[in-house]
Amino acid sequence: MKPGLWTPEPKEIRELRSLVRRVDALVEMRQQESNRLEVSDKVVKKGIEDHIEYLTIQIDSIKSQISQHIDNHPELRDKKKLLESIPGVGEATINLVLAHFGDTEKFHNAKRLSSFLGIAPREYSSGHSVRGRRRMSKVGKTSLRKALFMPALVALRYNPIIVDMSRRLTEAGKPKMLIVGAAMRKMVHLIYGVLKNKMPFDPNYSLKYY
């Protein structure tokens, strides 16, 4: 079977990704300045504080652009509403998902998406043995993987499906970070499921992607 013809991403996706990446860059820059502020001499503190204030204004402005951009495009707007239905998924995560992997047709299933993000588990091997703890592969999009960490922590408290999974893993004696990794993967399955099926999250209706 011949592979399908390559088609460029829609302009609205490329523009959204640029806006999201710009926010990420400015947030990182602001954090660097905040770190400097803690150790800088008094003579430069005012300048750093002014720069932090400027960066905050820029970040807020671009975030507003992102919201408006999504609202201006029906497909993005509809996907945003679906993602908002998942407990633990907030605005920052939604923006990142829509910008980087909102098109589920690129991935055959949620496991493929997990591998793309670098959160699929793998066994650590020693010589010819594959015994050992399962850990995240750490191969994939580092920024996307980091962006799923905090939502997973929130979901461990408020998302009924992930809370139940956490309880079972805890009772089985699994370590905390393994449970967090499992929560991140489950979040990806939920995200993939609602987008693929075009149905909002419903804990009482277990889709096969959950």
Residue ranges of model-derived segments:
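Short, mixed-charge aromatic SLiMs
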Residues: R17-A25, I57, G118-Y124, T170-M177, ...
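Short, amphipathic alpha-helical segments that act as regulatory/interfacial helices
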Residues: V20-V23, V27-R30, S34, E38, ...
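Long, charge-rich intrinsically disordered scaffolds of nucleic-acid metabolism proteins
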Residues: M1-L82
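Conserved hydrophobic/aromatic pocket- or pore-lining residues that grip, position, or stack substrates
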Residues: L55, I62, V89-G90, L113
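Low-complexity, acidic/Ser/Thr- and charged residue-rich accessory regions of DNA metabolism proteins
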Residues: H128-G132, L156, I162-Y210
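N-terminal alpha-helical segment
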Residues: I62, E75-K79, G90-I94, I161-I162
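Phosphate-backbone recognition surface of nucleic-acid-processing proteins
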Residues: E84-S85, E91, N95-A172, K176
